[in-house]
Each structure stands twice: as C-alpha cells, then as structure tokens.
Amino acid sequence: MTESSGGKRFGVIDDDRRRALSGLEFVQGLVDGTLPLNSMAETLGYDVVEVAKGHVVAAATPHAGHRNPAGTVHGGLAATLLDSAMGLAVQSMLDKGFAQTTLEFKISLLRPITPQTGLVKAEGKVISCGRRVGTAEGKLTDEDGRVLAHGTTTCLIYEH
C-alpha cells in the first residue's frame, strides 16, 4: 500500500474486509480515505470525492502528463473517470458480500480536454440495479458545468 502527499492511500482491500462492507460503505471508505483507492487512481491522479446511494463523483485535474501526441488530454482519462464513477455508483447500491465489474461501457467525447481545462468531475448515476446486472450513466464536466464527455455502462453483479 502506498500513500500520496495528500494523505490518500492506494492499494488493494483485503477480501474479508471488503465482503463485510455494503457497497455504499465501501465507496464511502474510498471517499473518506479509510479505504485505499486503486493504483489507477494513483497513476492518473484522480480521487473519488462524493457518494450517495446510486450516485458517485470522481475528479481530476488534467496535466501535461495526460496529453496524447496531438497535445490534448488522452481520451483514456475521460474514459477512466467515467468508468470509475459509473461503476462505483452501481457498487453503492449493493448489499454486503456482492461486488460488480464492468461488462461494457461507451463514452462520447464532446469537447477537447487540455491541461488548461482545470478540474473535471465525472458524475455517475444508477439507471437500474437488479440482482445480476446494473446500468448507470455518467457525464464529465468542467468547472463551468460544460459537458466534456458522457457515457453509459453495464455492470455484472456477482457474489464476492
């Protein structure tokens, strides 16, 4: 497990501890720092900043290290933020002993993102959550509320 200068921890959560938490408790732990974020969050510099049942927000500030060869921010940053926010929104609906994984997701990039864009937030909201499948939608916005990208996901729900 590693720790950032901001006090956030990164790593993998022990299976027994994870099974003992509801989905909402799990995501709340990511937000408040009592549970570690994944290593992708460390690599890309994003954080999970808000949670309510069926609703999650992840945020990042794009920087030069996120650029593609053309100079704009690589679409993978938007994809990762949306995948995280939407998937965790589904996770927040689950009972203890259950987890989810992304089966598929689709995003549409609407505006270029650059290092000058500033803070961006991906908001994921559950559309439907059944026993085996959950769906969610998401949007990525800048600080002025402009939609930079949007997407949908389908998640497989399984006993963990």
Segments from the language model and where they lie:
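Terminal targeting signals and extreme-terminal segments of soluble enzymes
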Residues: 1-160
